[in-house]
Amino acid sequence: MGMSQVDMALWDIAGKYHEAPIYQLLGEYRTKLPAYASTMVGDDQPDGLSSPEAYADFAEQCLELGYPAYKIHWWRESSLKRRIKLLEVVADRVGGKMDLMLDPASSLLTWGDALQVGKACDEYGYYWLEDPY
């Protein structure tokens, strides 16, 4: 038997003993969860997410729609310089007005590239960096 089954059984026993649901035993919980806008992977179509400016335009549209945050999935194949420029352009346009997040979806090929992107995210005030390498 795995440890998770034992853990669940112990929580069940504790809930029955205290006559309370487990979520109350664990502490606070949310009744609302904030949503954020998330892009698809960029492309090279003229009307798509084909440039840093196109990503920034879309971020502005999302901000106008009331989204408090914006997550970027960038181009699968592009130079590191272009990708970091994307982070800068979006941050210049909407940074400070909404949280910015980046999910490279394991598209960075080296630890060094991931480190450079992490530093850029820090420099431009990104809220999180997800799955870089």
Give the positions of each predicted feature:
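N-terminal capping/lid subdomain adjacent to the active-site entrance of alpha/beta enzymes
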Residues: 1-101, 105-123
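A conserved nucleotide-sugar
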Residues: 126
